[in-house]
Regions:
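Helix-start/capping segments and mature chain N-termini
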Residues: 1-40, 59-186
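Ordered, amphipathic secondary-structure segments that act as subunit-interaction surfaces
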Residues: 47-54
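Phosphate/pyrophosphate-binding loops at sites that engage ATP/ADP/AMP, CoA/4′-phosphopantetheine
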Residues: 41-46
């Protein structure tokens, strides 16, 4: 939500629907109900610039929860200078499904805090980079953008938008396996 307006609502709905389908959870979610719930949450609260988490559960019948969560976006200085990251050997069970995994979240949060890091870069068992624990990873190589293959990451809205902007501006995007020992070369 930016300035009280939901952004990329249809895309977020589509990504959530795909996660529900890929996870094998029963039931489904209706776009109009999704949209109306988001709009009602915004209308009934005074928050203008926060993220919304939508959690979907199914136990005999579907339950969808919509609630604001704290968000943090890098400052101009952090964008210019970069942020401290840490690598962590950890894989999500199905990277294409956005789901809550308490053990994963607790471990990543602890590692980020212990290392005073902004983000954790997830490293697979074969020493390849997948994505950030809560962000997309893109590397610049000359005039190209390098990112992990679709099979290794959450195919989220932000990633899709970044790739679209690159394509619209004739910036090459290469989706390929990125080895841990390559990171420093970017």
């Amino acid at each position: 939500v930016i300035d009280g307006k939901p952004i990329f609502l249809k895309e977020h709905f589509q990504r959530m629907s795909e996660s529900i389908n890929l996870s094998g959870i029963e039931g489904n979610i209706n776009y109009e109900e999704f949209k109306n719930s988001v709009e009602l949450l915004i209308k009934e609260n005074s928050f203008k610039n926060l993220n919304i988490r939508v959690s979907y559960f199914y136990d005999k019948k579907p339950l969808t929860l919509f609630y604001f969560i704290e968000s943090y976006y890098p400052s101009k200085d952090e964008f210019a200078e970069g942020v401290h990251t840490v690598t962590v050997k950890m894989e999500r069970a199905n990277p294409n499904v956005k789901s809550f995994q308490k053990e994963y979240k607790d471990k990543v949060t602890r590692i980020i805090k212990e290392n005073n890091a902004f983000e954790a870069i997830l490293i697979n068992h074969d020493n390849t980079v997948s994505e950030g624990s809560k962000s997309n990873i893109f590397f610049v190589e000359g005039n190209k953008l390098i990112t992990s293959p679709d099979s290794s990451v959450l195919l989220g809205v932000t990633r899709s938008k970044v790739i679209s902007v690159c394509e619209e501006n004739s910036i090459e995007v290469h989706k390929r396996i990125i080895r841990l020992d390559e990171i420093e070369s970017f």
